Amino acid sequence: LADALRHQRNGNYKQAIAAYLSILEHDPTPVEGRQARFHLAESYLLSGDYAAAAAAWESFLASYPEDPRLPRAALMAARAYRAIDQCEMAVPVLQRHVNSETVLADLAYEWIGDCHAGHQSFEEALAAYRAALDVSRVPDVEARLREKLASIYLDRGDYDTALAEYSAILRLALNEEYHARIEYEAGQVLAALDQPADAYARYHRVVESAPESEFAYPSLLALAEAGEKVDEFQAGLAFYYAGKANRDAYGAAIRAFDRYLAQEQVPKADEALYHKALAQQAMGRTPGALATLESIILEHPHSPWLEHAWYEKVVTLARTGSVGQAVQTYREMVGLFPDSDLAAEALWQVANLREGAGARAQAAVLYRDLQSGHPGFEHAGEALWRAGLIDYLAQDLDGAADAWQDLADTYVGSPFSAGALYWLGKLAGAGSSQPENEHWDQLVDQHPYDWYALRAAQIRSGTPLTGTRFVTEPLGPSHWEANEAEAQLLHWLAGWTDVPTSTVTAPADLTATLDQQPRLQRTRALLESGLREEAIAESERVLSAAWDDPLALGRLAFFFHGQDLYRLAARSAIRLAELWPEGRLNNAPQTLLRLAYPLAYTDLLSAEAQKRDLDPLLLAALIRQESLFEPSAESWAGARGLSQVMPATGRQLARHLGMEDYAEDDLYRPHVSVELGAYYLTTLLQVFDDQIPVALAAYNGGPGNTRRWLDAVAGDLDLFVETIAAEESRRFLRRVYEGYVIYETLYRGTEPSE
């Protein structure tokens, strides 16, 4: 049974199903038989074989009517029936068990309503949705239910009742975008009721209160079509924000602002001019944008938008290549706003633009000017770093050393000080195969787990950054003694928060109260019902509410970890370290580090590592950076699963591996994602001469780009890392390697220098 459960957890449902069937065929004990039947039905459902899942659940429900998991089983059975369009079977199952469901009763009623609505049984659907509302205590669920009620009333032509539902939704505390959508839809209902004045009032509210919303634009169009008079300033804002999705709207914004500015009373003339200039910039009308910004500067000397206008003028001039004018404008801006971070940001942008355009020497001067003029600016340390790197690439080693020494002396806590100390050490130890100097000693002391410290330690030890350093032995299961871990965390919290002494002496209190929290009860119930995405969404809301509460974050980190929600546990732990006055995760207790650097799916990591001669902890570090061990993770670019493989790459890798029945959704299955990720990393190591950092850069940025970056510096590894054109790829390789060493420290007991 343990093997079957492991296959199921790893997403290898075919193996899990075969294992459960084998158990049932070999005279299991009553307990084993019950467990095998329950998890067999689960596996069918998770695999997408809904007909088999429905049959398996029906058998389980009939065979074990007293099982405490029946409410969850009923939900999963109903989900299977609905997937094969058999609502006539789903509804009775839900109705039989809804009264025994204490946490997800609203969801059961909602699904009953969905089934009735799908079969045009509207009275039954309305009754089910109302029953769901009666038991729901979650605002988001209430809003969703009321939308479904409103939809039915609209389909039936009962606009007044639909409108009442929209009004009820608007009384809930929801985000601005959602509020704007409901307001807009309510306006459409009023228009259908032939109540144009009320409809227009709704549209006006959207335009005036939420001009950034995507529903401000259609509201504006509806008002314009009706010939309704609209505040031209608000119209300009709404058109401007709509321009991000519809470029033509920028032109409409400019015209609206012009009409506003032509009026006799223009109390927001400065703000209108500012957004007009931004719209002109977006349309490529640079001369017009500069003229508009100049109008703010000359005509509104006391405007709160004046500083922003100066900033935009500096950056706009720099974008056109008028660097001298941009710098002169910046100096005028500093004269007016000597302590302005926006002025510093303007010069920072100018320097970045010049460096990106290849004018590196000019950029280095600007970076130095920025740091000397604005030493407290958030990018001041990075400015010195970039100036030093530019000098180094130009063979001005003295200039580079000066910049990096200033950085190391002035910005000790800056993440860029580690790089400065590393390169100062390289300069000091030039020509020595075993550089030993105070810069590297200081680096290792101040930043022990930073890429640069690890690189220095690696050079000193003579250990190559290749696969020869891999330890390929299988990992043991990752576990800890919960009470001991909680006690350690509480003792640490007591040192810098107001955690009660009674809590510290009774570590069980850390998680004991969690079962009393309805939203966490709901999270657990959703997970037990196979609804992981819904559970994660619920947990995200809980985490958001606890974001600034150290004790709550500690509790949540343990709760999420215990529910295999590793990404949420890690985020809770990382946030807790951020709230700590020292603010350095690497100095936090080992318990917190283990929460922030989880180790899951060790059987998969070990199997793939041995098969491909990899280190399983390198795979763990890669997966942590990619997905924080969340199997359902999906990036904005479309990468999926634990290893964040792109669908196109996944298809190619699956062909190479002979996965005949591969489908894109398999990327969400841990055993597939880990295998593809390990195979891809192995391939890249082979392509790039077994160099770990280079292969990691290629994993993120692609082998073609990586080859160009490597060739541009003639294979110099340190310069390769510094000159990777894609910031994300540079950060990725560093973070994965840093994580690799942290994993070794946590789970192998080695030190960075070993």
Residue ranges and their predicted role:
Residues 723-726, 731-734, 739-754:
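Gram-negative outer-membrane assembly/targeting C-terminal domains
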Residues 665-666, 688-695, 715:
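Short, charged, surface-exposed loops that flank catalytic or proteolytic processing sites
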Residues 662-672:
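A short, structured beta-strand-centered segment in the mid-to-C-terminal lobe
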Residues 449, 690-691, 702:
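Short loop-to-helix capping motifs
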Residues 615-621, 689-696:
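Acidic/histidine metal-binding catalytic segments
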Residues 1-637, 643, 653-656, 662, ...:
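Acidic, polar-rich low-complexity tracts and alpha-helical solenoid repeat scaffolds
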